[in-house]
From Swiss-Prot:
Residues noted as binding NAD(+) in the record, renumbered to the chain: 19, 63, 105
Ligand binding (D-glyceraldehyde 3-phosphate): 134-136, 165, 194-195, 217
Highest taxon in the source lineage: Bacteria
Enzyme nomenclature, EC number: 1.2.1.12
Site positions per UniProt: Activates thiol group during catalysis: 162
Organism: Atlantibacter hermannii (Escherichia hermannii)
Primary role: Catalyzes the oxidative phosphorylation of glyceraldehyde 3-phosphate (G3P) to 1,3-bisphosphoglycerate (BPG) using the cofactor NAD. The first reaction step involves the formation of a hemiacetal intermediate between G3P and a cysteine residue, and this hemiacetal intermediate is then oxidized to a thioester, with concomitant reduction of NAD to NADH. The reduced NADH is then exchanged with the second NAD, and the thioester is attacked by a nucleophilic inorganic phosphate to produce BPG.
Protein's UniProt name: Glyceraldehyde-3-phosphate dehydrogenase
Pathway(s) it belongs to: Carbohydrate degradation; glycolysis; pyruvate from D-glyceraldehyde 3-phosphate: step 1/5
Keyword presence, NAD: yes
Any GO molecular function: NAD binding
């Protein structure tokens, strides 16, 4: 998905990929995607290299990032997407190998700073290793920031109705650390834990300790929903809240936070470029200090 997204950008060039898969299989997985459809472009393998839209891409299969010799292909930024090297110590091996910057595509497991567009990206100060947090945190944080900046959040709970992920089972199977997680993904709604709400406190320190949450894994292939229920410091009607979010979506958070009043469902957001889209018709208010936002 990172690769496909990069193909839409004129300012990003993919020059190398490191994966334990062979090049032929990588080409196949890029060409065909059950959720996002066929790749819009040419994909082939020549002399062990991946060639996409006529551009040659170096392919390696190193287990140790320190051996990747990123300097040989002029790498500026590495997208560390294995889910394995999530600390400064392990991710720094990419720097040792010649890369200038590393972006972790998941939450860091140490104090490596996390940055989320629409939340705290303005605090980025040139750090060479950063985390982009999780998909759920990217959805929640921009909305939480708008609400807190305008009305103040006393406390809140988040529930994410989360699409199936690759680690789930097609049918019941052993899962020693998470018994429920071992149940068939296509057959069940599975309660699960998530650190996404607490992670918001890392990117927005003013909300630290004020939010927590949980997840339900549901049998859909893509697109997840965040349900944020909060108590507000400053009383506000639901219409006031909608206006504040719409103003942010059309202003300083344009391209990150979206806003819709259409009667949408999850598949309408397949391939959505905004990290968070507020569904104005789906939320409700109990009173002017207690609201549920979707």
């Amino acid at each position: 998905i990172v690769f496909r997204a990069a193909q839409t950008r004129s300012d990003i060039e993919i020059v190398a990929i490191n994966d334990l898969l062979d090049a032929e299989y990588m080409a196949y997985m890029l060409k065909y995607d059950s959720t996002h459809g066929r790749f819009d472009g040419t994909v082939e393998v020549k002399d062990g290299h991946l060639v996409v839209n006529g551009k040659k891409i170096r392919v390696t299969a190193e287990k140790d990032p320190a051996n990747l010799k990123w300097n040989e292909v002029g790498v500026d930024v590495v997208a560390e997407a294995t889910g394995i090297f999530l600390t400064d110590e392990t991710a720094r091996k990419h720097i040792t190998a010649g890369a200038k910057k590393v972006v972790l595509t998941g939450p860091s497991k140490d104090d490596t700073p996390m940055f989320v567009k629409g939340a705290n990206f303005d605090k980025y100060n040139g750090q060479d290793i950063v985390s982009n947090a999780s998909c759920t945190t990217n959805c929640l944080a921009p909305l939480a920031k708008v609400i807190n900046d305008n009305f103040g959040i006393i406390e809140g709970l988040m529930t994410t109705v989360h699409a199936t992920t690759a680690t789930q089972k097609t049918v019941d199977g052993p899962s020693h650390k998470d018994w429920r997680g071992g149940r068939g993904a296509a057959q069940n709604i599975i309660p699960s834990s998530t650190g996404a709400a607490k992670a918001v406190g890392k990117v927005l320190p003013e909300l630290n300790g004020k939010l927590t949450g949980m997840a339900f894994r549901v049998p859909t292939p893509n697109v997840s929903v965040v349900d944020l229920t909060v108590r507000l410091e400053k009383a506000a009607s639901y219409e006031d809240i909608k206006k504040a979010i719409k103003a942010a979506a059309e202003g300083e958070m344009k391209g990150v936070l979206g806003y819709t009043e259409d009667d949408v469902v999850s598949t309408d957001f397949n391939g959505e470029v905004c990290t968070s889209v507020f569904d104005a018709k789906a939320g409700i208010a109990l009173n002017d200090n207690f609201v549920k936002l979707v």
